[in-house]
Amino acid sequence: EKVDPPDVPRDDHVDETRLHADDAEALLEYYRNNADDRVRYSRDHALLALAWYTGARLGGLRSLDIEDYNQDEEYIQFTHTPDQDTPLKNGRDGERIVGLPSHICDILDGYIANERHEVYDDYGREPLLASQLGRVSKNGLRAWMYLATVPCLHSDCPHGNERPTCDFVDYSEASKCPSSRSPHQVRTGSITWQLNRGVPPQVVADRVNTSVRVIKRHYDQPTKLEEMRERRQDHLDSLDFEDEGGDGE
């Protein structure tokens, strides 16, 4: 006998914590408009900009080399190289080329020219997102992202703290800030934002290396306000007495 699956609440399926588009925009504007080139072209800016505009996973971001960035054609290329400690989650199926907006390329150009550590990894490759010692570890990159997304960079602390005395602005403590975000949470926010901007689901899926089914189930998470706007756009015009046919009798 066929048994219908239980009606599981949406919150039980997914973790809806993400970097929201408004916060991403405020953070990126803080970096982009900063008068100090050390901030404008910082590693944190390059990391957040890449993560937001590509929707890439942590492993994909970590895998990038300088040669994977094509300045002239304005794209980044993800390559699966498991024998050199940079695998992609989906293996060869995860390999792809992702186009970048010109202003993101400007950031990467400035970062590479001014702030990137000129180092090699254990295999003689030049990691794009480099630490002082070479290719950053996964935990290290995760810590960088937490630090890059603390909200007091662009506005008053939403938790009542003062930046000069807040422990969360330290590299080792940023993950404890309730409003900082992990690479996965940035990816989730990016995918939702791309969909809300009208990019077709299949195009988003190709850019971020997942399926449309997975996007719909795990990443397409509009807020209540976004859901209202979608309902209004699709149906509000129908809720008008003046559009009804006949004389009303």
What kind of region is each of these model predictions?
Residues 143-206, 213, 221:
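Short, basic (Lys/Arg/His-rich) helix/loop patches that form interaction surfaces
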Residues 105-144, 156-166:
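Major-groove DNA-contacting interfaces characterized by cationic-aromatic clusters
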Residues 21, 25-58, 93, 123:
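Basic, Lys/Arg- and aromatic-enriched nucleic-acid-binding interface segment
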Residues 208-233:
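Catalytic-site neighborhood detector that most strongly recognizes the C-terminal catalytic loop/helix
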Residues 63-110, 117-119:
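Conserved tyrosine-mediated DNA breakage-rejoining catalytic core shared by Y-recombinases
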Residues 1-4, 57-59, 152:
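N-terminal DNA-binding recognition helix of tyrosine site-specific recombinases/integrases
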